[in-house]
């Protein structure tokens, strides 16, 4: 879903021309992990190991974004080795874990990559994400985000976190930039 106004039909449903215009300029996609790349559930094993499920469609979308010159970064409040491993598998080199104040990592990324805030999209699911979301060019909430986050976002995915929402956002960015048909990734 998107805010009111003229819209463009996509395979995910209508997207406002305002959102598509913002998406044209995105050079960096920042993602939260729990509730965005995963469904927000954490499975704890008897020996203290932590397990999460990641969607391969999201992985494919991330690989397509990366091969289409859109940087991808992770800023997450929790810290887990399996997130490091997933990032390594996908080719994500900008990983910030254990971030209770996500603005610090956001500022570091802008400086490191020499990117303006209006060229950044951020995908979040909860209120901890809003301080960064309100500063970027395109703020995205997943379909099952916290109810207070949804009306604030520029775009709300049709798909829930951990179920392909990130792929939806990647496809949206690539479509807006005229790169969707040429995008090549690999299923991971």
Swiss-Prot record:
Binding site for substrate: 34, 55-59, 63, 78, 86, 102
Residues that, per the record, bind Mg(2+): 32, 34, 125
Enzyme class, broadest EC rank: hydrolase
EC number(s) on file: 3.1.3.45
GO function term, MF aspect, one: 3-deoxy-manno-octulosonate-8-phosphatase activity
Pathway: Carbohydrate biosynthesis; 3-deoxy-D-manno-octulosonate biosynthesis; 3-deoxy-D-manno-octulosonate from D-ribulose 5-phosphate: step 3/3; Bacterial outer membrane biogenesis; lipopolysaccharide biosynthesis
Alphabetized SUPFAM superfamilies for the sequence: HAD-like
Keyword Repeat tagged: no
InterPro entries, per database record: CMP-NeuNAc_synthase (IPR050793), HAD-like_sf (IPR036412), HAD_sf (IPR023214), KdsC_fam (IPR010023)
Reactions the enzyme catalyzes: 3-deoxy-alpha-D-manno-2-octulosonate-8-phosphate + H2O = 3-deoxy-alpha-D-manno-oct-2-ulosonate + phosphate
Alphabetic keyword roster: Hydrolase, Lipopolysaccharide biosynthesis, Magnesium, Metal-binding
Cofactor: Mg(2+)
GO process annotations (BP): lipopolysaccharide biosynthetic process
Gene3D superfamilies recorded: HAD superfamily/HAD-like (3.40.50.1000)
Record carries keyword Cell wall biogenesis/degradation: no
Biological role stated in the UniProt entry: Catalyzes the hydrolysis of 3-deoxy-D-manno-octulosonate 8-phosphate (KDO 8-P) to 3-deoxy-D-manno-octulosonate (KDO) and inorganic phosphate in vitro. Also catalyzes the dephosphorylation of phospho-tyrosine in vitro.
Subunit structure comment from the entry: Homotetramer.
Family: Belongs to the KdsC family.
UniProt xrefs under NCBIfam families: KdsC-phosphatas, PRK09484.1
UniProt protein name: 3-deoxy-D-manno-octulosonate 8-phosphate phosphatase KdsC
């Amino acid at each position: 879903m998107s805010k009111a106004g003229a819209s463009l039909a996509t395979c995910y449903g209508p997207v406002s021309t305002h959102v598509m215009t913002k998406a044209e300029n995105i050079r960096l996609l920042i993602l939260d992990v729990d509730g965005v790349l995963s469904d927000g559930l954490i499975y704890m094993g008897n020996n203290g190991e932590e397990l999460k499920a990641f969607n391969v469609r999201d992985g494919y979308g991330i690989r397509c974004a990366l091969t289409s010159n859109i940087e991808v970064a992770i800023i997450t409040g929790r810290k887990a080795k399996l997130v490091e491993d997933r990032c390594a598998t996908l080719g994500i080199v900008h990983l910030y874990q254990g971030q209770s104040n996500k603005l610090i990592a956001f500022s570091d990324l802008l400086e490191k990559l020499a990117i303006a805030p209006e060229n950044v999209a951020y995908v979040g699911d909860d209120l901890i994400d809003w301080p960064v979301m309100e500063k970027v060019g395109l703020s995205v909430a997943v379909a099952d985000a916290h109810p207070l986050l949804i009306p604030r976002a520029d775009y709300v995915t049709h798909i829930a976190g951990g179920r392909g929402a990130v792929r939806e956002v990647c496809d949206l960015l690539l479509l807006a930039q005229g790169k969707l048909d040429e995008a090549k990734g690999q299923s991971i």
